[in-house]
């Protein structure tokens, strides 16, 4: 199986309308799964979740009214309400804030690598996306052609989201790791922040957008550019911390690593994030001539199974519910050659398919 692909053209509303019409089935899956997830993890009814998501509207409007128009188009095309699209785009803030570190659910292993660690000095980045297994059916591939100012976008969101992990024709990539914080505030939801970052052409611009304005939740954003540079930014309502590649390698999982954050944030409640970080370091650090194939192999790694880099359900015999997590895709991006390699589901079970920007 492969994800549905949609190319969005026209005005922001027209883009959203195309998105909603083309991905109506996948968006319905997102709505159904988030109704269950908000109830399971946060004890929220769907109406309560919709109401809570409205607090982020002022920050979205202040950033770009076009994003509001695009989300309205998605709602109209998919036959759902605007608030439901908004809740999908604010799902990180609704799910992950107000949680202690003991509530950690494993999500994602990310990397970036460049000279002197790669073969022919190519620049690579990527991640696994580990989340509720049922949401695997809701992932789509979104393309938005450039307009002469903003580059061509290629990203891989959950259906209904207008931002996500991906890359652009300027050779900039973006990956995401979930982090947890007890703090909560107003501000721009991380997936809207990610859309703005992907519209940038330089790493400096991307960094400025990553740290712009208040952050209502905690997240780790790894930004990499074909120029052979990368920045990793840990954000939460109290501030930011920045990590840089060491000898051409940068890796991150789901706990805080920045020097400031190590002093102010609790340890993670799950050992998975530490084990996956250690495995990523073993697979990428102090290596030479790293390639796309090497990264793909790393995403099939089962050390620490089932909560490994290639993650599998801990109770596979049980009926599949939103409580079961697994790797939903593996993504490797070659920024030098503007190519992405995507494996649906567990990379140990499915091939990586090449997609050009």
Predicted regions and their residues:
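C-terminus-biased signal that marks the final domain/tail of proteins
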Residues: 1-107, 199-240, 246-357
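Alpha-helix capping and helix-loop boundary segments enriched in small/acidic/polar residues
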Residues: 194-197
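Internal mixed beta-strand/loop scaffold within catalytic domains of large alpha/beta enzymes
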Residues: 91-192, 328-331, 340-343, 349-350
């Amino acid at each position: 199986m492969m994800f549905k692909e949609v190319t969005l053209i026209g005005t922001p509303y027209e883009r959203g309308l195309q998105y909603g019409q083309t991905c109506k089935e996948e968006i319905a899956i997102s709505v159904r799964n988030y109704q269950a997830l908000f109830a399971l993890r946060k004890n929220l009814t769907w109406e309560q979740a919709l109401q809570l998501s409205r607090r982020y509207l002022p920050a979205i409007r202040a950033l770009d009214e076009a994003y509001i128009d695009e989300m309205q188009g998605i709602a109209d095309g998919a036959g759902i309400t605007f608030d439901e699209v908004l809740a999908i785009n604010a799902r990180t803030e609704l799910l992950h804030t107000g949680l202690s570190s003991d509530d950690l659910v494993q999500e994602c292993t990310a990397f970036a690598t460049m000279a002197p660690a790669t073969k022919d000095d190519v620049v690579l980045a990527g991640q696994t996306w580990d989340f509720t297994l049922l949401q695997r059916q809701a992932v789509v591939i979104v393309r938005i052609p450039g307009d002469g100012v903003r580059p061509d976008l290629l990203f891989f969101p959950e259906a209904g989201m207008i931002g996500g992990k991906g890359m652009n024709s300027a050779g900039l990539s973006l990956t995401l790791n979930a982090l947890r914080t007890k703090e909560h505030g107003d501000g721009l939801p991380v997936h809207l922040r990610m859309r703005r970052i992907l519209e940038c052409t330089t790493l400096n611009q991307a960094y400025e957008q990553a740290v712009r304005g208040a952050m209502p939740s905690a997240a780790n954003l790894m930004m990499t550019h074909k120029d052979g540079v990368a920045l990793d930014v840990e954000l939460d309502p109290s501030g930011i911390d920045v990590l840089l590649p060491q000898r051409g390698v940068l890796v991150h999982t789901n706990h805080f690593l920045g020097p400031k954050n190590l002093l102010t944030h609790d340890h993670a409640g799950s050992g998975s994030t530490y084990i996956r970080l250690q495995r990523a370091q073993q697979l990428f650090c102090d290596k030479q001539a790293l390639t796309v194939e090497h990264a793909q192999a790393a995403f099939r790694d089962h050390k620490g199974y089932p909560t490994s880099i290639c993650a599998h359900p801990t109770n596979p015999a049980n009926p599949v519910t939103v409580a079961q997590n697994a790797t939903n895709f593996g993504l490797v991006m070659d920024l030098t050659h503007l190519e992405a390699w995507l494996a649906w589901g567990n990379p140990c079970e499915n091939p990586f398919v090449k997609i050009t920007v």
